[in-house]
Amino acid sequence: MALCSFFCCGKTSDRRDKWKKNSSTWRVFSLKELQSATNNFNYDNKIGEGGFGSVYWGQLWDGSQIAVKRLKVWSNKAELQFAVEVEILGKVRHKNLLSLRGYCAEGQERLIVCDYLPNFSLISHLHGHNSAECLLDWDRRMSIAIGSAEGIAYLHHHATPRIIHRDIKASNVLLDSNFQARVADFGFAKLIPDDATHVTTKVKGTLGYLAPEYAMYGKASESCDVYSFGIVLLELASGKKSIEKPSPTVKLPITEWALPLARERKFKEIADLKLKGNYVEAELKRMVLVALICSQSMPEKRPTMLEVVDLLKGESKENLSDLENDEMFRPEPAGISKVLSGPNGSSDFISEEKNSEANANEMGS
């Protein structure tokens, strides 16, 4: 990738001059400027932490608020991830994708500057420090589902070249002041040539969200993002984690819990108890069915993200009817069990480069 060698080689001043010519929407920050904005990366300014390092809240001289993602340790791998994220953030412009404000690359400091989103991540509202406040009513959940789907659809169908995110999960869906979704964290993203159906690569991401073909064989495609998004939808609908632990020795993927209930049309039992019954039944049903059709094990049977957007909006009665009558939702004969989820496992990162806490990553960990 051209950008990677661009960051790793050459003088900093040369890099700045070239990048300033290529962008009018973001800029190169000086380390001194970001130190001032974050009170010298003060602990009290820290709003998230992960394997990459830390995220800090900051305020620029003009009063605008920013989130600064600071790499913890410089290394060739970290440099590559930094370069990939800056390049992709610089390429994409969509209301449901996190916007790049700029970057800093001085000495061994690598920092990414983005908009500060005051409502943090989706995971913080479902499972983290904001979950007790119950700020996600049903209308907000539907808006988050559709908005994040539209952001991912942009990556798959409108970006040039196409982009596979490879790390879609609840902690990478951030929420602005109006609870509008912004998909974040492009450090693991891949650019896909027009003539390619997939890329074979080292597996990275989070167990519980990984598509089976990617987890087992390293085959990454847009369909892998669709699978991961299906898991996020189930979390949105149910308030449960991607992998639940009903007992200390049992780990249950959310798909294996939800699918039998969906087949029996027991959607009320899937709904998040924190909603207290305040949801639109038809929309809940739609979200759950879309989630499960996305997260089935066979990639060729998953919808595209454009189809997911259409289904979530419920604009085509014919498509909704086809969804409800899909064979995967037919009740199974007694004694027959069909596992549609990926391999069982913990929700810990499988890559040494990524390690997120439930309430970490308010800019994208």
Range-by-range predicted roles:
Residues 1-98, 107-113, 119-120, 128-142, ...:
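Membrane-proximal cytoplasmic juxtamembrane segment of single-pass receptors
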Residues 1-24, 280-286, 290, 297-365:
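Intrinsically disordered, low-complexity cytosolic regulatory tails
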Residues 102-103:
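A short, aromatic-enriched beta-strand patch in the conserved N-lobe beta-sheet
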Residues 150-163:
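Protein kinase catalytic-loop region centered on the HRD/HxD motif
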Residues 217-222:
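Activation segment
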